[in-house]
Amino acid sequence: MPDSQPQPSPSSSSGGRQDPSALLLCGARLTDGRTVDVRLGGGRIEAVGTAGSLASAPTRGSRVDLSGYLLLPAPAEPHAHADTAQSADTDGPVSYAPEDVQRRATEAALLQLGHGATALRAHVRVGDVQGLGALGAVLQARRSLRGLAELTTVAVPRLLTGVAGADGLAMLRDALKMGAAVVGGCPDLDPDPTGYVEAVLELAAEHGCPVDLHTDAADPGRLARLAAQCGGLRPGVTLGPCGALPAEHASRTADQLAAAGVTVVCLPQGSCGAVTGRGTAPVRLLRAAGVRVAAGSGALRDVSNPVGRGDPLEAAYLLASREGLRPEDAYDAVSASARAVLGLPEVRVEAGFPAELLAVRGERLAGALSLAYSRIVVHRGRVVARTSAVREYCNSAVAAESGLPRQGRGEVS
C-alpha cells in the first residue's frame, strides 16, 4: 500500500498559521508491516509517510516516538452499562444517588478509554424507582468526559405495554428529550414483546434515532418476528448479546437478521443484567450469513458480573481464541464494526481519516491481542491516555547465562 498523500489541514489554511496542537507519531508499525510516520492535525490524519520522511520536516506541534508500537484504529465500546458499572466494588447496598452514579460512570469510561475505547455507548435504565436520575447522572459524566472520549446513552425502560407500560413509555419520551441518543430496552421482559418492539420502533422513527435492544435470543420465533419488525429502519437496529440462540435454529435466524440489516453485539467477556446466561452468540455463523457483528464488554463489575476489565482488546482476544476468528476479524469486531454500531465514521491509518488511534506495544496484531500492556490512546488528534508497563526479573545466573531479555534497573528484592 503506498504512503498516503498529505491533506490540507483546516488549521493551516488561514494566514499560514500552524496548529499548535499538531502531533507527529514517529516510527509506528502498521498491520501491513510498514514502519511509518503519521502527522495529525485538526482532529484528522494529515499524512502518512515512510519512517523518517515526515520527522525530517520542520517541527510543529509535538512528537511521540512509537518505535516498537503497533498503530491501529482506535476501538470503541458498543455495549456498556454505565449506571451499574463498578457497583460490585461497594460495601452494602448499591447507591444510585446521582453523584455516585456519575462517579462510577466516569471512572468506568476512563478505565475503558485507557484501554483504547475513544467512543462508548452506555445503556442506562429509566423508570421504576430511579426515574431519570441515573440517566441525568450519566449525561453529566458525558459532559465531564468531553474532549477525552465520546459517550452516548441508551435509554432502557422495563415495561412499555399495558397499563404498567404507559408510565414507561412516558418516561422513555422524557429520556429522549433529556438527551438520550438511542432507544433501548429488553422486550423479553415485557408481557407483550411484540408490542414492546412496536413501541420502541415507533418512538425511534419519530425521533430519528437508532434502536439497541437486549435479547438472549432463546426464542428463535420471537427473534424472527423482531427482525421482521426492524427491517429497513434507519439509522439502524442493534441486538445483543444473543447468547442463548438455539444451535438448531441459528443458521435460519442468521439469514433473517442479515436480510433485516440488523447488527448483533456479542459479549465475549460475560453477560449483563438484562439477560440471563453466559453464552456467546454464534459469531462465525452470523458473519458468514452477512450479519455485522460487533463485540462489547457488557456488565463491568456489577451484581450480574462482579469481574471484568472493560478492555476491547480482551474481547477481541476471546473472539480469536474461543470463536476461531482471525485476529484481524476479531479486532474489526471491536473497532470498525463497533464504530459502525455507534454511527461513527470509519477510521484507517491513512490521510484524511479521523485521528482516533491506539498504539500498543508489539509488532503484530496477534501478539498485541495477547500482551497489549503498554498503550497510547489518541482522540481527536491528541494523546488522551497512556499506560506503561514494566516487567522486572531479579538477577540470576540462569538469566545471565541464557541471555534472556530483561527489563529493569538492578536487582528486585
What positions do the PLM features span?
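C-terminal cap of metal-dependent C-N hydrolases
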Residues: 349-413
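Active-site mouth loops of central-metabolism enzymes
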Residues: 90-103, 154-166, 186-188
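His/Asp/Glu-enriched, well-ordered alpha-helical/loop segment
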Residues: 210, 234-235, 281-360
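Histidine-centered catalytic micro-motifs
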Residues: 74-85, 211-218
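Active-site core of metal-dependent hydrolases
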Residues: 157, 161-163, 176-278
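Histidine-rich, glycine-flanked metal-binding segment
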Residues: 1-72
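Alpha-helical scaffold segments that flank or form the walls of functional sites
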Residues: 69-71, 75-77, 86-123, 128-146, ...
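Divalent metal-coordination and catalytic microenvironments
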Residues: 28, 43, 68, 79, ...
